[in-house]
Amino acid sequence: MGKAKAERRLKDNEAQAVARTIRVSPQKLNLVAALIRGKKVDRALAELEFSRKRIAGTVRKTLESAIANAENNHDLDVDSLIVAEAFVGKSIVMKRFHARGRGRASRVEKPFAHLTIVVREVEAKGEAA
């Protein structure tokens, strides 16, 4: 139904990694994604390693995958990579019930999210061309 999504075109100096259907709410995942946006990848990995958020490990694995994609698939220099984009999308929401008193039931929603990380190679400013 509807028209097909346009495929995102990456520039020559970019690489990405996507983690789909992560069992966390998009709001909570976005808090961790905001920690690494715009930072150098080594600094972002350090931030994620010492973050106390439960989902930081999954975000770290996705960032490491984006770095590996940049190095192996796009021949980019790992030392000059920054996190250009880290965005979160909604996925499915599983609905479950929770038994309450007097024979009643209430709904429990278990949300899922998607995470996309794009890394970009930048030139060093002090370098002579």
Curated annotation (Swiss-Prot):
Instruction: Provide a GO CC annotation, any one.
Output: cytosolic large ribosomal subunit
Task: Recite the UniProt keywords alphabetically.
Answer: Ribonucleoprotein, Ribosomal protein, RNA-binding, rRNA-binding
User: How does the annotation summarize its subunit structure?
Assistant: Part of the 50S ribosomal subunit.
Cross-referenced PANTHER family: CHLOROPLAST 50S RIBOSOMAL PROTEIN L22-RELATED, LARGE RIBOSOMAL SUBUNIT PROTEIN UL22M
Q: Which family does it belong to?
A: Belongs to the universal ribosomal protein uL22 family.
- The superkingdom listed in its UniProt entry is Bacteria
Q: Does the keyword ATP-binding apply?
A: no
According to its UniProt entry, this protein's organism is Sinorhizobium medicae (strain WSM419)
GO terms assigned for molecular function: rRNA binding; structural constituent of ribosome
GO-annotated biological processes: translation
Q: Could you tell me which Pfam families the record lists for this protein? A: Ribosomal_L22
Task: Quote the function comment for this protein.
Answer: This protein binds specifically to 23S rRNA; its binding is stimulated by other ribosomal proteins, e.g. L4, L17, and L20. It is important during the early stages of 50S assembly. It makes multiple contacts with different domains of the 23S rRNA in the assembled 50S subunit and ribosome. The globular domain of the protein is located near the polypeptide exit tunnel on the outside of the subunit, while an extended beta-hairpin is found that lines the wall of the exit tunnel in the center of the 70S ribosome.
Put simply, this protein is called Large ribosomal subunit protein uL22
